[in-house]
Amino acid sequence: MDSTNMRSGMKSRKKKPKTTVIDDDDDCMTCSACQSKLVKISDITKVSLDYINTMRGNTLACSACGSSLKLLNDFAS
């Protein structure tokens, strides 16, 4: 048996694509619904706040998808 006959019955494996994780300095939180980036408190002076939709209390609305964002401790109350 030569090597070509042995390979004919075997499934060929596809190589997984290499993924690289880019660790940005501007790591910021993302919206859990649409994954758009949210403003960090340290960047508050650099960003125009006209697009932030405040709802009631500590709840914000994501300007990209409209979902409501609130603190985790607000879920208990």
UniProtKB/Swiss-Prot annotation:
Predominant cellular place of this UniProt entry's protein: virion
Region Disordered: start-end pairs: 1-20
Keywords annotated in UniProt: Host cytoplasm, Host nucleus, Phosphoprotein, Virion
Keyword Phosphoprotein listed: yes
UniProt subcellular location: Virion; Host cytoplasm; Host nucleus
Record GO cellular component, one term: host cell nucleus
Top-level taxon of origin: Viruses
Family in the record: Belongs to the orthopoxvirus OPG146 family.
Function text: Plays a role in the maturation of immature virions to infectious particles. May also participate in viral transcription.
Summary of subunit composition and partner proteins: Interacts with capping enzyme RAP94/OPG109, the two large RNA polymerase subunits RPO147/OPG105 and RPO132/OPG151, the two early transcription factor subunits OPG185 and OPG133, one of the capping enzyme subunits OPG113, the nucleoside triphosphate phosphohydrolase OPG123, two core proteins OPG129 and OPG138, and a virion protein OPG064.
Protein name from the UniProt record: Protein OPG146
